[in-house]
Amino acid sequence: MGESRVKVTLRYHEFVNGKVVISRDALAMLKKAHYGVYGHATVELCHWTKSALTGGPSCYKVKFYGAPVGGSHRCVEVGPVGMMCSNKCIYCWRPSESFDPYEPGYDEVMSPEEIINGVLRERRRLLSGYFGHSRSSRGKVLEALQPTHWAISLSGEPTMYPRLPELIKAIKALPNTKSVFLVTNGLYPEMIERLWREDALPTQLYLSLNAPNRELFYKIANPVIHRDDAWERVLRSLELLSKIPTRTVVRITLIRGWNTMEDLIPQFAEVLGIGNPHFIEPKSYMNLGHSVYKLTKDNMLRHSEVREWSMMLLKALRDRGMDYVFMDEDPNSRITVLQNMKRYVDRWIEKPTNP
């Protein structure tokens, strides 16, 4: 990663003065979908941000971990390399068929400061309409303009951004930042190593693990970069999760008919033992966005089924000597969370007043 030359034909990006940017056609598509775009970075007001702005509930992460501090309206969901990814996952609700499998070089990308300033400007634009919203108070919008939390997890794979350690450090240095979450598909363990080595680990690192073996991984994740050793890279990332000095989570997206079969649960437990994460989040696939062209509503689980699967996983983990407990659940998001008691960390980043 990091060579400054084009190795693939870019469909949704172009070069301007040597820097990669989202192309005009892709920009129009993203703007129509209510994204903010700056260069190669993307930002969005997610469902839970909009809900919190208009008096509704916040994201399950507030309930589970107390982040974003103050509520979901104070979250910045950002993709530092929007529409670039190493995988084309079958369940992705982003337009992954519109992603370029390209690893940008250091000299081809914007600086962290450019990303932060551009993303915050675009986010202010997206928030501006809420000043006149009938169900949103001016105070809520003003709070939203002072974000406490950054979720580096939007369109694209963030660990493909070669200046990610600098970006996380710069975000942490902002006066209102309380937490930074990073979500990765695990294909770039070398970036996780860099984050650790350069003292730039996020507050909480998520790894998406949606298959317990190599064969199923290739069917679900469909890696297009590092295809020959993609599964081995995920395993290396899991090994790093067991060592790095920050909070770690493995999220499992459950897709009926693909990875929910009972005979796969012991395999999941075995692979999870490599990462030994602080938390495990089994969550139902949701038939939203562009995933509707690949999967159906029948592939979704009811929350009761997610809970039942989680309890079976809990037993399989304990059978292998791992001491996890059922920590919490959120039926609205069809998600549960298991907590590691041997590798214990307090669940709260900052305990909410009304968790």
Listing of model-derived features with the role each one plays in the protein:
Residues 4-82, 96-115, 119-144:
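N-terminal [4Fe-4S]-dependent radical SAM core
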Residues 78, 85, 89-92:
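Short cysteine clusters
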Residues 85-88, 99, 214, 287, ...:
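Short, acidic Gly/Pro/Ser/Thr-rich loop/turn segments
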Residues 90-91, 95-101, 289-291:
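Surface-exposed beta-strand-to-loop junctions
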Residues 136-296, 301-304, 308:
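Conserved AdoMet/S-adenosylmethionine-binding subsite of the radical SAM
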